[in-house]
Amino acid sequence: MVQIVISSTGAEGLAEWVLMELQGEIEARYSTGLAGNLLGDLHYTTEGIPVLIVGHHILYGKIIHLEKPFAVLVKHTPGKQDCDELGRETGTQYLVTALIKNKILFKTRPKPIITNVPKKV
């Protein structure tokens, strides 16, 4: 299972992320990996159905509301500049940067996108 996070702005001041769940594996074309690279295009139909286009393949998904939302936390460990009035270091703090309330599930196999196949080679 591959999980991908998409960022958007929320109404409460926190970013609201959407979790994308894909079945199977996604392999990078080169050995550099997928981090920081464009995976594909996410679109929505007029009915609100999510459509993911990856290369020459198309996937149809559905939006699922999570019963228990996830919080995205950033760990902040104290340093020399993080001291209280008495010079003692403050403890480790966690900052909530985003909430994940929905996920997009792509559970079907990708369908190839074929356009204009020539009859003569």
UniProtKB/Swiss-Prot annotation:
Chromosome cohesion factor involved in sister chromatid cohesion and fidelity of chromosome transmission. Component of one of the cell nuclear antigen loader complexes, CTF18-replication factor C (CTF18-RFC), which consists of CTF18, CTF8, DSCC1, RFC2, RFC3, RFC4 and RFC5. The CTF18-RFC complex binds to single-stranded and primed DNAs and has weak ATPase activity that is stimulated the presence of primed DNA, replication protein A (RPA) and proliferating cell nuclear antigen (PCNA). The CTF18-RFC complex catalyzes the ATP-dependent loading of PCNA onto primed and gapped DNA. This is Chromosome transmission fidelity protein 8 homolog. One of its GO terms (biological process) is mitotic sister chromatid cohesion. It comes from the Eukaryota. InterPro entries: Ctf8 (IPR018607). The keyword DNA-binding applies. Component of the CTF18-RFC complex, which consists of CTF18, CTF8, DSCC1, RFC2, RFC3, RFC4 and RFC5. The CTF18-RFC complex does not interact with the Rad9/Rad1/Hus1 complex. The CTF18-RFC complex interacts with POLH. CTF18/CTF8/DSCC1 associate with PCNA. CTF8 exists as a dimer with DSCC1. The lineage of its organism: Eukaryota, Metazoa, Chordata, Craniata, Vertebrata. It is found in: Nucleus. Its main location: nucleus. Coiled coil: none annotated. One of its GO terms (cellular component) is Ctf18 RFC-like complex. Pfam families: Ctf8. Belongs to the CTF8 family. Keywords: Cell cycle, DNA replication, DNA-binding, Nucleus. The gene is Chtf8. GO terms for molecular function: DNA binding.
